[in-house]
């Protein structure tokens, strides 16, 4: 059995250390108040048994909590008091330097917590380690200097989660929609070099990847770009190629019909589109940003975003090539085609591509084929989104359709009625269009809903009182995020604030006016709605006895966001948090505070946002229909999914699910398995098995358990992860049931 030390390193459990610790405290009290040797060993054995049954790799802090409980259970309160004093003294000693051990264990690749924190970072690589080292320093500064103690304590106890404290020391924001159109059409500056409007599609793609890398290095959250912004350069290349063909024919003294010339031009154009799309795919997965990872970038594919029929035709060619190349995948170091994590693709389901007789249905068929093999694209319903996202003056069904920022964070609709009066000085400003590209999110703080419920002891009046108190705590924490960004100079990230990605401010100008008035958002996250409802009502939120309470919880959070927004002119918005490593942290905190409660705290994870519990039997269509209700109440960020088996031979069923998404839910994805064993060549699902109390990945064909010799891709938190996960998230992945 393994345990995790405070430094994050994983070591073998040693019962003798528990025995010795209890004996040391025992010797500090009078003989008449001491435990017998038999009681000492009995207590240690009970602790060991509790660790075995915990369902996850326990930490030193958890073990010490168990020791305290055991001593007090034996009515030796004086011994327990001395043990608590000993822990307190050791804690004070550790506070003198909170980072050295963590950083040293990180460098030596012994820090298990860091190894499993981010499923898209490889913590053995020098550049990643440097980012993690900086992150540990930032976390330390955040907790000791930058945040009020009440926020720090609430975060450490798992009442709330203050996200991305490893970047909070700097003046950095979360995620955004890159105004790629402005940068490509009107020029930008990268690393002090002027980049003018490109003269071909392939050059535009190359510049786009440089912009993606620069943006990723200037923020900590995801970014999104639209293929629509690249579409005009298809016509630029078409005209350029047409001129080249004409010159070649003239030089050869050959004449050709207009139709033949058109065929040659279009063939060469498609080849250039292929090369341009390939540039984006390979650059994105091979670039290393200052965050120690490939850029978290989402590529948006929305045909109705095109301005003219010709541009829409050209955009369709780009979308087609993007889907074809993603279906193919990328080669791993052994030359085997595998599923890449990035870029994330979002395909908009529209009236002209979703049904069999629609003109762009061939793209939807290709998207279905790609999803069945590579788990992308994800799907946004134009129909449902235009019902929900209403800018000033718009009516239901005539609203806006736009991409999320990264994996799931959505901007609030444009409430200005004039594109925010071009507060960002964009050169592609149109006062008659709602403004989305160039806007961003300031950050997230998440409330632990199961903790609110458990703290109330099933007393409804007490629940709402505690809920309001915790929400106000989140509010104060979010204001800390907002105030950290206030006063930030545009010089802090020129690519973002001066050269068009988000704004074109002057040097030395602050970004303050972009933080209010609705231009940017700030997110109240939530997690564990299922566990919260289960504890308070005894029912899943999918059952009629639990659904009304779940909806009331969601509405209360929306009401609070509206209240805070009215008071401050900051766009607070409710966000379904994509817990990755934090799901494990919250679960451990709940077990520490409330013990093991069947159906509520008996897992190493809690359920993301409003989702149906991963182990609950429900079919794909019922799940999407049910969760669609909650997406309406999660306007700042939401994504739903269905787990499916290998669907490569049943694409009609995939398309049926996609059509159901179009009619019933704004944003959803299909999860399948796409793994490869480098030892035996097995191509299928790598299984999760238990080994000495720890969950490990194992090839079902040859038994290989070496994570360095397998490629595993699983959807976690809206992105595809490929670097493995902590024990809590791994347990959640194991427990997922199929919905189709």
State each model region's role.
Residues 1-109, 734-739:
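Charged, amphipathic alpha-helical regulatory modules used
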Residues 89-92, 96-518, 539, 543-705, ...:
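Conserved catalytic cores of very large enzyme subunits
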Residues 14, 694, 716-719:
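Conformational switch/transducer regions in large eukaryotic molecular machines and scaffolds
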Residues 273, 277, 281, 534-535, ...:
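Metallocofactor- and cofactor-centric catalytic cores in central/energy metabolism, strongly enriched
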Residues 701-740:
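Long insertion/accessory domains within large nucleic-acid-processing enzymes
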Residues 23, 475, 479, 530-534:
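Amphipathic, well-packed alpha-helical segments that form the structural scaffold of globular domains
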Residues 301, 522-535, 555, 715:
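Contiguous, well-ordered alpha-helical segments that form the cores/surfaces of helical PPI scaffolds
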């Amino acid at each position: 059995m393994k345990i995790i030390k405070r430094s994050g390193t994983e070591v073998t459990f040693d019962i003798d250390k528990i025995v010795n610790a209890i004996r040391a405290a025992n010797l500090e009290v009078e003989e008449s108040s001491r435990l017998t040797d038999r009681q000492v060993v009995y207590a240690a054995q009970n602790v060991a048994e509790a660790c075995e049954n915990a369902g996850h790799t326990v930490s030193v802090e958890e073990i010490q909590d168990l020791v305290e409980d055991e001593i007090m259970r034996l009515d030796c309160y004086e011994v327990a008091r001395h043990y608590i004093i000993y822990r307190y003294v050791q804690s004070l000693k550790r506070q003198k330097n909170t980072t050295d051990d963590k950083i040293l264990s990180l460098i030596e690749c012994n820090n298990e917590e860091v190894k499993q924190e981010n499923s898209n970072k490889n913590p053995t690589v020098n550049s990643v380690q440097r980012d993690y080292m900086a992150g540990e320093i930032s976390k330390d500064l955040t907790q000791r200097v930058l945040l009020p103690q009440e926020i720090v304590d609430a975060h450490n106890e798992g009442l709330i989660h203050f996200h991305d404290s490893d970047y909070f020391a700097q003046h950095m924001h979360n995620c955004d929609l890159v105004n790629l159109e402005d940068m490509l059409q009107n020029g930008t500056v990268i690393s002090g070099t002027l980049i003018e409007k490109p003269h071909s599609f392939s050059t535009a793609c190359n510049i786009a990847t440089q912009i993606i890398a620069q943006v990723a290095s200037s923020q900590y959250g995801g970014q999104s770009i639209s293929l629509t912004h690249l579409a005009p350069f298809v016509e630029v290349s078409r005209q350029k190629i047409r001129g080249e063909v004409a010159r070649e024919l003239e030089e050869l003294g050959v004449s050709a019909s207009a139709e033949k010339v058109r065929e040659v031009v279009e063939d060469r154009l498609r080849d250039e589109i292929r090369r341009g799309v390939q540039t984006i795919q390979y650059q994105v997965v091979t670039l290393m940003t200052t965050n120690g990872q490939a850029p978290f970038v989402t590529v948006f594919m929305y045909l109705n975003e095109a301005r003219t029929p010709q541009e829409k035709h050209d955009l369709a060619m780009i979308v087609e090539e993007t889907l074809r190349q993603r279906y193919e995948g990328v080669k791993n170091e052994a030359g085997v085609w595998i599923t890449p994590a990035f870029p994330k693709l979002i395909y908009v389901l529209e009236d002209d591509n979703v049904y069999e007789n629609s003109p762009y249905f061939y793209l939807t068929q290709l998207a279905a084929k790609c999803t069945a093999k590579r788990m992308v694209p994800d799907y946004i319903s134009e129909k449902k989104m235009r019902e929900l996202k209403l800018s000033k003056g718009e009516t239901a069904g005539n609203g806006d359709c736009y991409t999320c920022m990264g994996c799931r964070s959505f901007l609030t609709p444009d409430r200005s009625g004039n594109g925010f009066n071009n507060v960002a000085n964009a050169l592609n400003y149109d006062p008659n269009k709602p403004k989305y590209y160039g806007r961003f999110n300031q950050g997230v703080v998440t409330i632990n809903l199961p903790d609110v419920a458990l703290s109330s002891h099933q007393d409804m009046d007490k629940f709402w009182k505690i809920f309001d108190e915790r929400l106000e705590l989140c509010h104060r924490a979010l204001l800390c995020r907002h105030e950290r960004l206030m006063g930030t100079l545009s010089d802090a990230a020129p690519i973002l604030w001066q050269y068009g990605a988000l704004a074109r401010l002057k040097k030395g100008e602050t970004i303050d006016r972009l933080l209010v008035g609705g231009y940017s958002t700030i997110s109240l996250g939530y997690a564990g709605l299922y566990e919260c409802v289960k504890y308070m009502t005894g029912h899943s939120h999918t059952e009629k006895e639990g659904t009304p309470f779940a909806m009331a919880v969601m509405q209360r959070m929306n009401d609070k966001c509206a209240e805070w927004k009215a008071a401050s002119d900051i766009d607070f918005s409710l966000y379904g948090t994509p817990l990755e490593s934090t799901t494990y942290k919250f679960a451990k905190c709940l077990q520490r505070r409330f013990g093991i409660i069947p159906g509520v705290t008996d897992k190493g994870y809690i359920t993301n946002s409003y989702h149906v519990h991963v182990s609950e039997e429900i079919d794909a269509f019922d799940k999407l229909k049910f969760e669609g209700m909650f997406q309406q109440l999660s306007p700042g960020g939401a994504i739903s999914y269905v787990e499916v088996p290998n669907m490569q031979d049943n694409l009609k069923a995939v398309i049926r699910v996609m059509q159901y998404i179009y009619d019933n839910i704004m944003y959803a994805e299909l999860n399948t398995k796409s793994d490869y064993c480098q030892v035996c060549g097995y191509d299928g699902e790598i299984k999760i098995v238990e080994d000495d109390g720890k969950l490990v990945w194992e090839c079902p064909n040859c038994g290989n358990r070496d994570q360095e010799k397998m490629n595993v891709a699983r959807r976690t938190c809206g992105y595809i992860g490929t670097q493995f996960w902590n024990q809590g998230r791994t347990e959640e992945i194991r427990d997922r049931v199929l919905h189709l």
